[in-house]
């Protein structure tokens, strides 16, 4: 399986994490780690999410970008890492 890290900027809304996790799960990714820091100056959340899957990370990136409360999604490590079982 491939391991990826996403950096996400989102609006600080009550349902944003639920939507983020739901889309991630629907697309066949497993969340292996997540950190979130609120930015009170501009009402945004800075989220770093690690995921693993055999699916294309680009597809997940585009799906998350479509969410209303998501401002930006970038893949932190373009080259995937192989995770041993």
Locations of regions flagged by a protein language model:
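A conserved regulatory-domain signal marking ACT and ACT-like small-molecule sensing domains
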Residues: 2-85
């Amino acid at each position: 399986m491939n391991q990826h890290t996403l950096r996400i900027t989102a609006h600080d809304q009550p349902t944003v994490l639920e939507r983020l996790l739901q889309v991630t799960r629907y697309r066949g990714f497993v969340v292996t780690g997540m950190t979130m820091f609120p930015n009170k100056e501009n009402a945004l959340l800075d989220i770093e999410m690690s995921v693993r899957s055999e699916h294309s990370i680009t597809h997940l990136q585009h799906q998350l970008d479509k969410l209303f409360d998501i401002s930006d999604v970038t893949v932190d490590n373009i080259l995937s890492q192989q995770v041993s079982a």
